[in-house]
């Protein structure tokens, strides 16, 4: 893509992360035994917020309206020269690991192994028989996956500069420990805007997710062949695995026919759901506004989909290139929602 430098940003957590899902976490709000449970994997909105906050020279004024927030985020991406973000995924060394859903489980698989076994079982998969394919994936699933760590604590009160236990207000917090070398995203940066801005994040410390858990960043240039493109490669039609949720918004609609789930845009087939789950995903928490972002229906990360004939996956907005829409769909696509890794 002309005028764009491509980078791989590696996020290396130094402690377990708290990647909050929907719901409040406050012992006083729900009484005793309040609980916070981390999601298993980073959301694109968390990664985008992390990068934008590090690259900005000064804080921005909070906004109360959601669509005003969307417009402002697009302005910030343009100002910082961030054309697109694709991912995230896990990696051990240079080997990418991608999420896969089997029933209610989410685990991670070497992308090359996944593509190999998918092609071997393709004839059965196209007939709707996924049992052999999923059984094989469970046998080769890797230990490079998130693990939950539960901790128990009690609420505190501050009186005259001293902290005291608030009797009866217990809480549990389940953090996620990412068992891999790093979490990766691929970023297209406008070569003419803020030159070297992403490169200066190399070696920087970052606060990730809830409670500001610490991670270290590493930035590599992809153009020189240093890193392999996983989610930033463009293609048309074919099978792919979702690295991040594909948020479903009008004019997209779900159609169920003969046991198959497909997504249509108008009368055209957009994609078919081969395996995985349709559920709900929140778009994160805005620290500046101190409020949660909206929740939308989505095809969840780890699902395998088939882009219908003529449907494109592009670097700039991913699969949303096929969907006419406004600023929200543009933002979702640019920050990485609907990121795909092709399976051939």
Task: Outline where the language-model segments fall.
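Conserved active-site/ligand-binding neighborhood in enzyme cores
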Residues: 2-344
């Amino acid at each position: 893509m002309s005028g764009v430098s491509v980078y791989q940003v590696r996020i290396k957590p130094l402690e377990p992360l708290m990647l909050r899902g929907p719901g409040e976490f406050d012992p006083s709000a729900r009484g005793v035994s309040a609980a916070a449970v981390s999601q298993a994997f980073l959301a694109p909105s968390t990664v985008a917020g992390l990068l934008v906050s590090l690259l900005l020279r000064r804080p921005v004024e909070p906004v109360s309206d959601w669509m005003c927030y969307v417009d402002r985020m697009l302005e910030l991406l343009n100002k910082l020269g961030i054309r697109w973000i694709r991912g995230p995924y896990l990696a051990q060394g240079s080997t990418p690991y991608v999420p896969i859903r089997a029933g209610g489980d989410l685990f991670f698989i070497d992308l090359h192994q996944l593509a190999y076994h998918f092609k071997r079982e393709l004839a059965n998969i196209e007939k709707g028989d996924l049992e052999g394919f999923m059984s094989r994936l469970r046998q080769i699933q890797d230990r490079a996956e998130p693990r939950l760590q539960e901790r128990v604590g009690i609420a505190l009160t501050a009186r005259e500069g001293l902290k005291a236990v608030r009797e009866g207000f217990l809480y549990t917090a389940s953090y996620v420990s990412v068992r891999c070398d790093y979490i990766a995203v691929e970023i297209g940066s406008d070569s003419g805007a803020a030159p070297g801005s992403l490169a200066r994040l190399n070696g920087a410390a970052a606060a990730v997710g809830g409670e500001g858990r610490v991670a270290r960043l590493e930035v590599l240039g992809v153009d020189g062949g240093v890193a392999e493109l996983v989610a930033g490669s463009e293609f048309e039609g074919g099978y792919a695995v979702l690295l991040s949720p594909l948020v479903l918004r009008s004019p997209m609609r779900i159609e169920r026919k003969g046991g198959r789930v497909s997504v249509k845009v108008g009368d055209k087939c957009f994609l078919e759901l081969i395996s995985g789950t349709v559920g709900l995903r929140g778009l994160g928490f805005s620290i500046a506004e101190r409020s949660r972002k909206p929740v939308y229906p989505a095809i969840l990360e780890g699902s395998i989909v088939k882009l219908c004939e003529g449907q494109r996956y592009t670097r700039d907005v991913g699969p949303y290139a096929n969907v006419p829409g406004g600023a929200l769909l543009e933002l979702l696509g640019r920050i990485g929602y609907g990121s795909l890794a092709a399976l051939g």
